């Protein structure tokens, strides 16, 4: 799978641009503020319906316009597919895939799986468990068609349960919701656990390439003691949950644990090593997607030279090239990327003040 055409209108400082990307490595270079990262952001927006840089998606709309428009042609195994997205300043979003209106943004994610390696993506290890749950759930969503429905039901039931707790409801009023919660929580947990097991098999080899002298152990924690019956736990913790006004244990507390010896990886590794670990996680996830559903991710790699030294840039780019996936990578100086590749980039784009030029 690859993008063969990308149209961007009124997205940040890009008023209008059309790119014809190539399979393989697409290098986008330009000075800070030129708009090169905005191209990556536009691709992400088209696949996720939101930005990886701002929770307020209205901010990505060009100041002179009331809407942004993104359009892409995807080359898939079954043929070409066309995706269009329009976001209005009012917050309304309109999505079409092959001319048909799409109501759920999850359909975008299913159609256009994206992996991001940016300065912000390293928060996967530095922040709390939420970002690591999202990492697991991205893979589980693509790997198992039952996951999205179960995950949606977990969120729905958890919201209802927490509302009852805040209202001081008796356990007899909560018990029905607990039965639902247990059913969907166990389904979500089983899919997550299976996914992490599969990921681990690939991850070991990739971590060995990036960090050959480091033994990283990866494990999944479900959000409650695996030896404890979840229904019993919810009943036993009712008083505690009532006091706090929310559900203390459950799949919404799950985490991906990474350890070196007895220490969390965050405490045992240098910042540079942690960045390589995140790169390994992203590459493993993309490779697993290809194994499980025979679809490539599209990789968006922002400002690589400032994040990794020359040796590790070369290693990462080799790993990305070997996946066979389409990659978009940005840099201020194109030589920093070109010199790290064994073969020239498939295509190069120069960006200046929001204007994009292909370099022949």
Curated annotation (Swiss-Prot):
Q: Name one GO molecular function term.
A: ATP binding
Task: Please give the SUPFAM superfamilies that the UniProt record associates with this protein.
Answer: P-loop containing nucleoside triphosphate hydrolases
Gene3D superfamilies found in the cross-reference section:
P-loop containing nucleotide triphosphate hydrolases (3.40.50.300), RecF/RecN/SMC, N-terminal domain (1.20.1050.90)
Q: Which domain of life is it from?
A: Bacteria
Q: Name the residues that bind ATP.
A: 30-37
What coarse category fits the chief subcellular location reported for this protein? cytoplasm
Pfam families, per the entry:
SMC_N (PF02463)
Give the keywords, sorted: ATP-binding, Cytoplasm, DNA damage, DNA repair, DNA replication, DNA-binding, Nucleotide-binding, SOS response
Gene Ontology CC: one annotated term: cytoplasm
The reply on keyword ATP-binding is: yes
Respond yes or no to whether keyword Nuclease is given for this record: no
Q: Name one GO biological process term.
A: SOS response
Where in the cell does this protein reside? Cytoplasm
Q: Which family is this protein grouped under?
A: Belongs to the RecF family.
The job of this chain, per UniProt, is described as:
The RecF protein is involved in DNA metabolism; it is required for DNA replication and normal SOS inducibility. RecF binds preferentially to single-stranded, linear DNA. It also seems to bind ATP.
Name-wise, this protein is: DNA replication and repair protein RecF
Question: Which organism's genome codes for this protein?
Answer: Shewanella baltica (strain OS185)
């Amino acid at each position: 799978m690859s993008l063969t055409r990308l149209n961007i209108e009124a997205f940040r400082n890009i008023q209008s641009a059309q790119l014809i990307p190539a399979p393989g490595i697409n290098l986008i270079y330009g000075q800070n503020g030129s708009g090169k990262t905005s191209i990556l952001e536009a691709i992400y927006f088209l696949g996720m319906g939101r930005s990886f840089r701002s929770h307020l998606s209205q901010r990505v709309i060009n100041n002179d316009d009331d809407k942004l428009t993104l359009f892409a042609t995807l080359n898939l195994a079954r043929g070409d597919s066309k995706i269009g997205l329009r976001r209005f300043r009012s917050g309304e979003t309109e999505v079409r895939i092959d001319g048909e209106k799409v109501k759920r943004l999850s359909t975008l994610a299913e159609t256009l799986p994206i992996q991001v390696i940016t300065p912000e993506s390293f928060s996967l290890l530095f922040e709390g468990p939420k970002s690591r749950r999202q990492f697991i759930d991205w893979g589980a969503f693509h790997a198992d068609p039952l996951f999205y429905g179960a995950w949606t039901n977990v969120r729905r039931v958890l919201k209802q349960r927490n509302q009852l707790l805040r209202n001081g409801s008796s356990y007899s009023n909560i018990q029905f919701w607990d039965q639902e919660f247990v059913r969907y929580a166990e389904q979500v947990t089983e899919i997550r656990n299976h996914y992490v097991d599969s990921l681990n098999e690939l991850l070991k080899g990739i971590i060995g390439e990036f960090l050959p002298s480091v033994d990283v152990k990866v494990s999944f924690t479900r959000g409650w003691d695996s030896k404890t019956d979840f229904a019993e736990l919810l009943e036993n913790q009712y008083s505690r949950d009532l006091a706090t006004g929310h559900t203390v244990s459950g799949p919404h507390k799950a985490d991906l644990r990474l350890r070196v010896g007895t220490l969390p990886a965050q405490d045992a590794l240098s910042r540079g090593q942690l960045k390589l670990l995140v790169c390994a996680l992203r590459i493993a996830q993309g490779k697993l997607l290809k194994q499980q559903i025979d679809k490539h991710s599209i990789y968006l790699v922002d400002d690589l030279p400032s994040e990794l030294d020359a040796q590790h840039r070369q290693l990462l780019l080799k790993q990305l090239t070997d996946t066979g996936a389409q990659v978009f990578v940005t840099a201020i100086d194109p030589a920093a990327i070109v010199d790290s590749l064994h073969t020239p980039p498939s295509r190069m784009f120069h960006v200046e003040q929001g204007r994009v030029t292909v370099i022949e």
